[in-house]
Amino acid sequence: MYKRQVYYLTEAALQGRDILFDQNGKYNLTIRRMLEAVYTGYKGDKNTPDFKAMEVYLKRVWFSNGIHHHYGSEKFVPGFTPEFFRQAVQSVDAATLPLAEGQTVEQLCEEVFSVIFDPTVMPKRVNQAAGEDLVLTSACNYYDGVTQQEAEDFYNALKNPQDETPVSYGLNSRLVKEDGKIQEKVWKVGGLYGQALEKIVYWLKKAEGVAETPEQKAVIAKLMEFYETGDLKTFDEYAILWVKDLNSRIDFVNGFTESYGDPLGMKASWESLVNFKDLEATQRTELISGNAQWFEDHSPVDGQFKKEKVKGVSAKVITAAILAGDLYPATAIGINLPNANWIRSHHGSKSVTIGNITDAYNKAAHGNGFNEEFVYSDAELQLIDKYADVTDELHTDLHECLGHGSGKLLPGVDPDALKAYGSTIEEARADLFGLYYVADPKLVELGLTPSADAYKAQYYTYLMNGLMTQLVRIEPGNNVEEAHMRNRQLIARWVYEKGAAEKVVELVKKDGKTYVVINDYEKVRDLFGRLLAEIQRIKSTGDYAGAHDLVEAYAVKVDPALHAEVLERYKKLNLAPYKGFVNPKYEVVTDADGTITDVTVTYDEGYAEQMLRYSKDYSTLPSVNK
């Protein structure tokens, strides 16, 4: 039963892969399929620098589900020439190319070559630069022919400030202008992305037949109804049922979930995760969520912004069985859903830490030389070695279980009031909640931290990352763009600046290299508390100007000299700044009647092998989706 349920849900997850490619950019499916046709069908020399560079480019496109970086959102620069690629495309069997009806190979090249090779065409998937039209300058495929002002006006007209249970406007549609009229093209069966959603529904239907509990059966039925109707009220009903389904050992996310890929933060990318509960590790998160009211009451936030009664925060540690869509191959380590503020305050939220993913990261990080290069002295190294794995997991738990679930909006405040800054402010709020409490004696009392000093490992690595080492993920000359990175720099730079007079945190030089030194850990905690109070105020009151000022002052700009130094030191370590995961492969064993008797799991599939299999077996959408 369990195995069949996991198998059906993983199939439902894999069927959605093409949706995300198309959401990330309208040429992504065409370009991916051209590259795959050349990669598999090219008869020329595959050892030339051009072919090798094309292979790297294709592997990056697979990794980012498109031609823009999955994190920084800048467009990839191909290391191969247009001449090589044109000749290669013309040399393969035309039947393997994504040609539109009546289109020649030459016309196909003409259509997409500027998108691949011209750095000025669609340079950024999500543009967050203040003062620009964020919709027109972003390459993501959530809007077509509309300006930022038109998009904002369209959705503001739909909103009713008096509605206390608003739907997530715009969540599941592309906003387009056709014949001068602005309208939504909804992602649903029979609508946009219908071919993929039909397949997802087919496998969900099978999963419904072997659901573990009546609650889970109801969740799956409601999700199918949402996919079939595209009705956002139905989506809210599904989210409420999902939050309340706490007894199933197997759980899943499948749908349009996070809005980081939309410059206006409304439209959601498609993702899926199938998982089962890690019963032993979940005791840790249940201890935290069981004390949620204590944490809320004692937080350093103004009382008017606190929840009087914390509702249904459920927390668990899970083992991921499959990653898909926007969670594959690079994934989150923790998830807290649903995102609708009113559902969270009325019905609670589900928070998960993905145990097998954090475990893999921890194992990969030990002994790779990174800390030895960037940590100031042996004293900090010993702290990190002793406690960082524990405090890091705890910080994730606190961020997901309590941070996102804490605080409240004042009545009448639009949840989208912070616009483009909303994601960064929300991530900073959750991180600060975790940072403030990871140092609390309450955690030692609950047996969650092994000693009163353990939190120092988290404070040191967090500030080192926010002030310095996360810059390894950014190209020279670029700003910080991604919401999670912006939030970390915002917190670290703000604490550094506000504590400067007392030298709470310093950047010092030793042997010509820059290091972070924390001189007063308790004052750092006080500063985290002060910033948490301010960020909660901004969120609760919908203070757009306050969000703008904080983010633009601390989170965006990079010190070019420090950046160059960090990149130089990192380069010598020969490490990759991002990590992704290959999924296990599930196969069914059937009896003579075709009934499933077992599901086998194998882990021997390579990265390119898996990506090509997915492109073959789960190609659910045409190359152009209008």
Sequence positions of predicted segments:
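Short, glycine/acidic-rich hinge or "gate" loops at secondary-structure transitions
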Residues: 18-23, 214-221, 235, 413-416, ...
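Active-site recognition of the HExxH zinc-binding catalytic motif
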Residues: 213, 391-408, 430, 435
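C-terminal interaction module
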Residues: 281-304, 308-316, 494-567
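Post-HEXXH active-site segment of zinc metalloproteases
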Residues: 407-428
